[in-house]
């Protein structure tokens, strides 16, 4: 049975991609990061998400693969992406199809706000 976890920016499937189709698998997890291209990514930031995913999957080693566990991994990755955004490692893609600022309004520095509103 195909299990999946879908959040705004993370999709995880118990499947592998063959001929551009998802094929159910008991041994492979497929990760789709930011499918709507809401953010601008550099390779280093994207690799951080993949490494975090690997760490989270490893932390569930020996446990049953359930939809609940996949959702926990997906939620943890959402929080990780939010932290990358807050640290300025990624930014919103202003050319995205939809601008919904799902992780908060972008911060724009101006002379009046410079140095204020830091997390």
Curated annotation (Swiss-Prot):
Reactions it catalyzes: a plastoquinone + NADH + (n+1) H(+)(in) = a plastoquinol + NAD(+) + n H(+)(out); a plastoquinone + NADPH + (n+1) H(+)(in) = a plastoquinol + NADP(+) + n H(+)(out)
The terms under GO molecular function for this entry are: oxidoreductase activity, acting on NAD(P)H, quinone or similar compound as acceptor; quinone binding
Where does this protein reside within or beyond the cell?
Cellular thylakoid membrane
Question: What are the TM regions of this chain, as residue ranges?
Answer: none
* Gene Ontology CC, one term: plasma membrane-derived thylakoid membrane
Top enzyme class: translocase
Instruction: Give the keywords, sorted.
Output: Membrane, NAD, NADP, Plastoquinone, Quinone, Thylakoid, Translocase, Transport
Q: Cite the EC number.
A: 7.1.1.-
Read off the InterPro entries from this record: NdhM
Q: How does it sit in the membrane?
A: Peripheral membrane protein
**Family affiliation:** Belongs to the complex I NdhM subunit family.
Query: What's the stated role of this polypeptide?
Result: NDH-1 shuttles electrons from an unknown electron donor, via FMN and iron-sulfur (Fe-S) centers, to quinones in the respiratory and/or the photosynthetic chain. The immediate electron acceptor for the enzyme in this species is believed to be plastoquinone. Couples the redox reaction to proton translocation, and thus conserves the redox energy in a proton gradient. Cyanobacterial NDH-1 also plays a role in inorganic carbon-concentration.
Q: Which HAMAP family match?
A: NDH1_NDH1M
Q: How does it assemble?
A: NDH-1 can be composed of about 15 different subunits; different subcomplexes with different compositions have been identified which probably have different functions.
- Its name, as the record gives it, is NAD(P)H-quinone oxidoreductase subunit M
């Amino acid at each position: 049975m195909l299990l999946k976890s879908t959040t705004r920016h993370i999709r995880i499937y118990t499947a592998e991609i063959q001929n551009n189709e998802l094929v159910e698998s008991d041994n492979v997890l497929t990760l789709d990061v930011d499918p709507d291209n809401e953010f601008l990514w550099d390779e280093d930031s994207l690799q951080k998400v993949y490494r975090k995913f690997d760490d989270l999957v490893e932390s569930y080693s020996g446990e049953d693969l359930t939809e609940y566990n996949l959702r926990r991994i997906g939620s943890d990755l959402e929080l990780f992406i939010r932290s990358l955004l807050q640290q300025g490692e990624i930014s919103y893609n202003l050319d995205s199809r939809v601008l919904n600022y799902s992780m908060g309004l972008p911060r724009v520095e101006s002379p009046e706000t410079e140095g204020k509103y830091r997390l």
